[in-house]
Amino acid sequence: MNRAVAPASIAPPAANYSHAIASAGAELLLHTSGVVPTAPDGSVPDGLVAQVETVWTNLIAILEEAGMVVADVVSITTYVVAGEDLGVVMAGRDRVMAGHRPASTLVVVPALARPQWRVEISLVAAR
């Protein structure tokens, strides 16, 4: 059975999609959409460090809403607008993962869907 995961503690999706779908069966699988740096009030913080922190806050809220924790994350895909920002993005990921090492893909892109977004992250978690 699949169910949409939509924590009330984060901003709603920016378009017609779910933040995440939790799939239950022999195991629990969670596939998130690309999560962007939008705060619950709809604002986007200035600065890459704050944007990375907001994305991870949103991702952790999604994990918790699905009954999962960071240790359940099996794959991360990160999109970043500027190659020189990779160190900041990786440091944010490493801080949140706290030694947990899921598969990870980091892609430098020319732009994201909204010009103020500098980072977008999706993940897969399984338990």
Per-region residue spans from a language model:
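Short, polar/acidic, helix-capping and beta-turn segments at strand->helix junctions
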Residues: 1-127
